[in-house]
Regions:
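Intrinsic-disorder/low-complexity signal
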Residues: 1-222
Length: 222
């Protein structure tokens, strides 16, 4: 049986992984081309000062995975500052810093998180994948941006174009994996998370923002 890719829409019905032949090592990824933007707001004003650097800023998009138990209490966060969980069932492949600069770069995903579902701890019930802009630039401005979810055989089984992201959104909950009756379900909250760059806020505050937003989305769905 051939396996097709799918474009997902906001608040689509959850997909059971077993029914869509996704198994083994799952992959959440993002790809985009190198994008340089002029400084905005206060940064633009400061750039006009003598000896200040007024060069455009290259977009740096970061992919993170927030792991929750059944009651939506956070038990782990995988991001560029913590590349894997204790049993290595979730692994971040590293921080790309900028988008693809060459044809060869464009053939790979700039950031990727791999998940081995059969090795996840029993306490892990929900995995929320968040894409954020390190320099607080709107995600949608990244050239040829695409978000993917799949497995090693078909890493782009599901994909979302950055064109579907709200114009001013800087951080977005893009994928949600949840245990359901012995299976795993994939959904796409497309929930705007109000975050600034990770280095400027504690991980606890970032996690609280993600948790609050996802819980609001969950209540809206049901």
């Amino acid at each position: 049986m051939s396996r097709k890719t799918h474009v997902l829409k906001e608040y689509f019905d959850p997909v059971k992984l077993s029914e869509h032949q996704l198994d083994g090592t799952l992959i959440a990824g993002v790809s985009y081309h190198f994008t340089s933007l002029e400084k905005q707001g206060l940064a633009a004003l400061l750039a006009k000062l003598p000896l200040a650097d007024d060069a455009p800023v290259a977009m740096d998009l970061d992919l993170s995975c927030f792991v929750y138990d059944k009651g939506f209490n956070v038990i782990d966060v995988i991001w560029y500052g913590n590349l894997r969980n204790a049993d290595e069932s979730i692994r971040h492949q590293g921080d790309a810093l900028v988008g693809a600069k060459s044809f060869e770069d464009s053939l790979i995903q700039q950031e990727q998180i791999q998940i081995k579902l059969d090795q996840l701890p029993d306490t892990a019930h929900h995995l929320i994948f968040v894409l954020s802009s390190y320099h607080n630039q709107p995600l949608r401005k990244a050239q040829k941006g695409m978000i993917y979810f799949g497995d090693k055989e078909l890493p782009k089984a599901y994909h979302i174009s950055f064109d579907q992201i709200e114009p001013d959104c800087q951080s977005l909950a893009i994928w949600q994996l949840s245990r359901y009756r012995g299976d795993w379900e994939l959904s796409s909250p497309m929930a705007d998370i109000k975050l600034t760059k990770l280095s400027n806020k504690s991980l606890d505050k970032i996690t609280d923002a993600v948790t609050t937003r996802i819980q609001a989305v969950q209540s809206k769905r049901w």
